[in-house]
């Protein structure tokens, strides 16, 4: 992969952040980030991270950001149309660009769907972390200086009090044995505040935790003003 130019799908979480670090360490030039946000909410889809934090993250990476808005309760048809539009904008900005990376780790069905979608849009998808031992990867992330906080917890898989906790060694010790240490089965999502992929840390302030769809506990965060 050395020497390639690449776009990165950015979720605001640890896997995308670590994929960025891995690619940069491998000699890949990541030229920009692309992120989907839910229209009307101004938050990253799935993670629920505010747009203001997304912008702070992009600034910390010193990479340009392409924002793609999708409707609430988005189906595949609407998602694919919005994503295609975002990739078209990327190619207009970086003519000839044809590779996009995702931070997928384990789920083959999701990876297969994305590979097929990207191929239809004349892009090649790269998953630099796919197949990693997630126990080792989680510890490697923490040892490497990644700082993240759980911003969403699936309460059908984890107790609600895990929402808002730091993604640290203490969290890994407390996770039930059947829970993936990287939350790769949807057990939790994270918001990254610092790491080797950032030029500087971002400071966030924790807000309230709310339950959505009688299942998902979202902890709100805002940029902490100096």
Regions found by a protein language model. Give the residues of each.
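Nucleotide-activated chemistry modules centered on ATP-dependent adenylation/adenylyltransferase
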Residues: 1-226
